[in-house]
Amino acid sequence: MWKADQWKDYEVLDTSDGEKLERWGSFYLVRPDPQVIWSTPRQDPRWKRFDARYARSSTGGGHWSAHHLPEHWCIHYRELTFQVKPMNFKHTGVFPEQAANWDFIDDQIRRAGRPVSVLNLFAYTGGATLAAAAAGASVCHVDAAKGMVAWARENAAASGLSGAPIRWIIDDCAKFVEREIKRGRRYDAVIMDPPSYGRGPSGEIWKLEKDLF
């Protein structure tokens, strides 16, 4: 089993009754987690002095209850820097568990001993993109959401990778791949972490079971 055990700015402190208590840098967040099906005593005092808590609504969605929480702040993983921004549907812009994959990407690229080109699809805020670029690869970062690509570029700048060979593409991933095939473009590695549901830049509806499987 791979473990994302190199974090210093993130940790799961406790879990109980469908929620997890996390530390993101110097801030404590409480977020729902459907995998937490057990009920245990909440003995950690930080359950009561969290900086923000996301509560689901019975009608769908939910909202954050925040106490003196900034709009965004930065956390670090090894040499990478990420902006954390609590947003809709409990997300923060970073999936800390993906760090195990970032370590794998870093290792494979460094061991290749030659230039490596990577295509990162559904690239979100750029965790895998930054890991690949920091290891020396040239990366094509593709996501349908303009805001996510802008956020990824901010993460790259914060990580000292503004000058890295990264192509930033706002496009429907499937359509982009079709065009790359027609152009005869080849990559050494393709990374994909698609959402189960989403929308393209022109409002196209994406469903994992329909559009990928």
Feature-to-residue mapping (PLM):
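Conserved SAM-binding motif I beta-strand of class I
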Residues: 138-143
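Conserved acidic residues
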Residues: 26, 116, 188
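Mobile active-site "lid"/loop adjacent to the S-adenosyl-L-methionine
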Residues: 146-148, 170, 187-213
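Conserved alpha-helix/loop element of class I SAM-dependent methyltransferases that forms part
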Residues: 96-114
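S-adenosyl-L-methionine
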Residues: 144-191
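Conserved class I S-adenosyl-L-methionine
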Residues: 113-124
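Non-catalytic substrate-recognition/targeting regions of SAM-dependent transferases
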Residues: 6-22, 29-96, 103
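Conserved SAM-binding loop of SAM-dependent methyltransferases across substrates and taxa
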Residues: 125-137
